[in-house]
Amino acid sequence: MQCFSFIKTMMILFNLLIFLCGAALLAVGIWVSIDGASFLKIFGPLSSSAMQFVNVGYFLIAAGVVVFALGFLGCYGAKTESKCALMTFFFILLLIFIAEVAAAVVALVYTTMAEHFLTLLVVPAIKKDYGSQEDFTQVWNTTMKGLKCCGFTNYTDFEDSPYLKENHAFPPFCCNDNITNTANDTCTKQKAEDQKVEGCFNQLLYDIRTNAVTVGGVAAGIGGLELAAMIVSMYLYCNLQ
């Protein structure tokens, strides 16, 4: 009985933490959606890399709602000893765990396919909005400066972009010796072609692979917590009268 009470208390505390994390994600998501520029000024390249591939604001809001609801469900189920709530909590967490494993496998096995898919989404956006949409341009500038890269694939992503049409040059990040913007020389097509600055997608993959141990450790830690939460919820479910 003491063991059951201890596990029940730990379940409540753990899910209270999850509940608060969900609320924080929701708040940050709303912040990014309303004022992405100030978010970038604070977090810089740490946040901007992912903003090329997904709408981070909406993504964080969606993730926050799920985590918020999951934390509430876990707290409610443990506190009221509701078998229905505990089983619902278990199955939602199981689905999330399976989705994460599937996403990891797809990312590892189908990297080339993912790159092609993202290229179809991101490159047209660069050609359309870089140089005309302030927030979009700032996100890319922060990313290219932080990762020392150029475009999604390379400098050709900026062809026909508003920036190129207005400045008759490519972004300085596409020319290694002009990144600091101290030189008078503009980043011409010939210069960008000669410099061969890596695209941000490949650079991001390189950074992830370089820090594979850290990334893997974080992923394993999250997976371990999810498994532990599922085991505890099932233990409580099975020991309730």
Curated annotation (Swiss-Prot):
Mapped to this chain, the residue ranges on the Extracellular side of the membrane are 35-53, 112-214
GO BP annotations of the record are:
protein stabilization
Q: Where in the cell is it found?
A: Lysosome membrane
Bilayer topology reads: Multi-pass membrane protein
- What is the first-listed, main subcellular location in coarse terms? membrane
Q: Which keywords does the record carry?
A: Glycoprotein, Lysosome, Membrane, Transmembrane, Transmembrane helix
Which stretches are Cytoplasmic in the membrane topology? 1-11, 77-88, 238-241
GO-annotated cellular components: cell junction; lysosomal membrane; nucleoplasm; perinuclear region of cytoplasm; plasma membrane; vesicle
Query: Where are its TM segments located?
Result: 12-34, 54-76, 89-111, 215-237
Signal peptide start-end: none
Glycosylation positions in this chain: N141, N154, N178, N184
Task performed by this protein: Structural component of specialized membrane microdomains known as tetraspanin-enriched microdomains (TERMs), which act as platforms for receptor clustering and signaling. Participates thereby in diverse biological functions such as cell signal transduction, adhesion, migration and protein trafficking. Regulates neuronal differentiation in response to NGF by facilitating NGF-mediated activation of NTRK1/TRKA receptor tyrosine kinase and subsequent downstream signaling pathways. Plays a role in the inhibition of TNFalpha-induced apoptosis.
Subunit structure of this chain's protein:
Interacts with SLC19A2. Interacts with NTRK1/TRKA.
- State the protein's name: Tetraspanin-1
